Amino acid sequence: MQIKAHCKINIGLNILRRREDGYHDIETIMVPVRGLYDEIEVAATEGDSIAFEQSGIVVDCPAEKNLCVRAARLMQERYGIGGVSIKLDKRVPFGAGLGGGSADATAIIVAINEIYALGLTKERMAELAAELGSDTPFFVYDEAMICRGRGEVMTPIEVPLRGLWLAVVKPMNEGVSTAEAYGGVTPRLPERGLEELVSTPISKWREGIVNDFEPHIFKAHPRIAEIKAMLYDKGATYAAMSGSGSALFGIFEERPTITDDDDTFVHIEQM
């Protein structure tokens, strides 16, 4: 079975409070990016082994710790399925805040549900995905969602992006860990929620829709801040860092002219 694991962007990211379990309550809007994805081939095999091959972008991670393998192992533990062969063509940059690894994990759960005819509902697959990451359940539904709690409490939301252009830019030599992102943030309660703000014209988003990680990440990684400024210089109506970074995105009325080089990864698509 061939499956495309689409990545996502975050429109706004409010860090509301630190919880007793060590996680943070957040509010964010996740939007799928249809044209930027990892390609994964999944097949059932005899026995109970998990075979994993990876091509494309090189990720310095032992196979047993890869989210694809962890997702397959979770499905074996819960449902007693047989072996699984996974071939991952990695195209989504990692350490970017685009959810590439989470999308891969969810794709494995969805694929195994189909090839082993488990009959799981989307709700059940989302519960399983939540065991592998806070944003992982989003990729079961693959539609715009406002996400609360750790990110796993999701409600569909209309985001007026159809027909507009999206540019995703990641500095290749800059990565931001989740620990670094949360380590420098001060939780706060915003005056206006994202559900209200995203319903305003996109030209107004710059005034109110923010990513709470940006101030300290930009201070520690000036190159990331420079890319956001570049997106506005190129004519973006709205630009922001996605998730915990280091990727940024810009929303444009017309196709922007942004070229990639040895220093940056660039993806452009019409939404």
Locate each region found by the language model.
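Generic non-transmembrane alpha-helical segments
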Residues: M1, R70-R78, R124, L128-E131, ...
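ATP-binding N-lobe of GHMP and related small-molecule kinases
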Residues: M1-F94, E114, L118-E123, V159-R162, ...
